[in-house]
Amino acid sequence: MPAKEKTFEESLNALEEIVQRLERGDVPLEEALAAFQEGMALSKQCQDTLEKAEKTLTKMMTENNEEIVFEESEEA
């Protein structure tokens, strides 16, 4: 049975914990690399979730003939 995918909030919290651990600088190299890899996967999952939410909102607003404008992030 596949593992349950984390919610956006769970993923974001896990990502924040990884960042804090790596910023301390006391993590062995192998562990740091594994944590970084996990952080990148969590970051992608969060980004995908946000993009899906934006598309859903855009569709809902379009169906109601309401204008919606999302500003592009400079980080993208």
Curated annotation (Swiss-Prot):
Pfam families attached to this UniProt entry: Exonuc_VII_S
Hydrolase recorded as keyword: yes
InterPro entries found in the cross-reference section: Exonuc_VII_S, Exonuc_VII_ssu_sf
Biological process according to GO: DNA catabolic process
Keywords of this entry: Cytoplasm, Exonuclease, Hydrolase, Nuclease
Predominant place of localization: cytoplasm
Gene3D superfamilies listed in its UniProt record: Exonuclease VII, small subunit
Catalysed reaction equations from the record: Exonucleolytic cleavage in either 5'- to 3'- or 3'- to 5'-direction to yield nucleoside 5'-phosphates
The EC number(s) this enzyme carries: 3.1.11.6
A GO term for molecular function: exodeoxyribonuclease VII activity
Subcellular location: Cytoplasm
KW Cell cycle (keyword) present: no
GO cellular component, one term: exodeoxyribonuclease VII complex
Highest taxon, organism lineage: Bacteria
Subunit structure: Heterooligomer composed of large and small subunits.
Family membership: Belongs to the XseB family.
HAMAP family per the UniProt record, alphabetical: Exonuc_7_S
Function: Bidirectionally degrades single-stranded DNA into large acid-insoluble oligonucleotides, which are then degraded further into small acid-soluble oligonucleotides.
Protein name: Exodeoxyribonuclease 7 small subunit
